[in-house]
Design a protein with these regions (language model features):
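Extended, subdomain-level signal for the structured scaffold at the beginning of enzyme domains
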Residues: 1-108, 117-120, 149, 176, ...
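A generic structural signal for alpha->beta connector loops
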Residues: 39-41, 105, 126, 144, ...
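Glycine- and other small-residue-rich loops at beta-strand/loop junctions that grip anionic moieties
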Residues: 87, 128, 164-167
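Structural detector of well-ordered beta-strand residues that form the stable sheet scaffold
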Residues: 108-109, 130, 148, 163
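Short acidic/polar capping segments at secondary-structure boundaries
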Residues: 115-116, 123, 134-136, 152-154, ...
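A conserved active-site-flanking secondary-structure segment within enzyme catalytic domains
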Residues: 125-154, 190-191, 195
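Conserved anion/nucleotide-ligand pocket segment
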Residues: 155-194
Length: 238
């Protein structure tokens, strides 16, 4: 059983947590359909046990305080982003706990702007990293971090220990990559289908969606044309 833990804090982005964790939960469901035991146990860790209000206005429940957790019991530790992260960038007890956790967990990663928390802990020094496109400039302030702001995520099976993802829903793509590495591509694809993912995107794909380009056009006729083209690539477009 792999124990997957995600930090939560006031004003955290709820989808940074629920998106990736649902991927792991759905992987358990796929295994159950095959008569196999669950592969993952999921945990939320806060500064203290109890409800934590997200930026969406609803609360998630931290089952335990992170300071009480032995990182060696965790397979994967995820650090999400959100408006509340600014209060954590100089939260020395948390940053020190993350430093101590890093060599003891099998995998440590961030979702969205959670990369800034890892950067402030010094854990991204000498590593490539990405984050939400709106926070790339802030991450570039850390000179020892190789910022690759176009990437969807930086997870690689060849270097699986430390990784980051781009904004919000990119955390789902990151979690699918982790599931694929753990349980195989068929399970990851089954989860993507179950979650009605449009694409299972690789980590080196840009986080800017070409499919959203038509939405940026203010000319309705041009917008309609740009929407029509990718749906009709088999036709003569000359």
């Amino acid at each position: 059983m792999r124990h997957i833990a995600c930090l939560i804090y006031p004003q955290v982005m709820s989808l940074d947590i629920t998106g990736p964790l649902q991927v792991f939960a759905s992987a358990n469901e796929e295994r159950a359909r095959l008569g196999l035991p669950p592969a993952y146990a999921l945990h939320l860790l806060g500064e203290q046990a109890g409800p934590v209000v997200t930026s969406a206005g609803f609360a998630l429940h931290a089952e335990q305080a992170w300071a009480e957790v032995d990182p060696a019991t965790l397979d994967t530790l995820l650090v999400p982003g959100g408006r509340g992260e600014t209060a954590l960038l100089d939260h020395q007890p948390l940053l020190q706990w993350l430093r101590e956790a890093e060599p003891r967990v099998r995998r440590l990663g961030s979702v969205c702007s959670g990369a800034l928390i890892l950067a402030h802990a010094g854990l991204l020094d000498g590593h490539c990293a990405t984050t939400h496109w709106a926070d790339v400039a802030a991450l570039k302030a850390f000179a020892r971090v190789d910022v690759q702001g176009e990437r969807l995520h930086t997870y690689s099976p060849q270097a699986p220990h430390l990784f980051t993802s781009a904004g919000v829903t990119a955390g789902i793509d990151l979690a699918l990559a982790l599931v694929e590495d753990d349980l195989g591509r068929p399970v990851a694809l089954a989860v993507a289908r179950r979650l009605v993912m449009f694409l299972k995107r690789p980590g080196d794909q840009a986080q800017f969606s070409a499919h959203l380009a038509p939405e940026a056009s203010r000319a309705p006729r041009l917008s309609a044309l740009l929407e029509w083209i990718p749906a009709n690539l088999g036709q003569d477009l000359s």
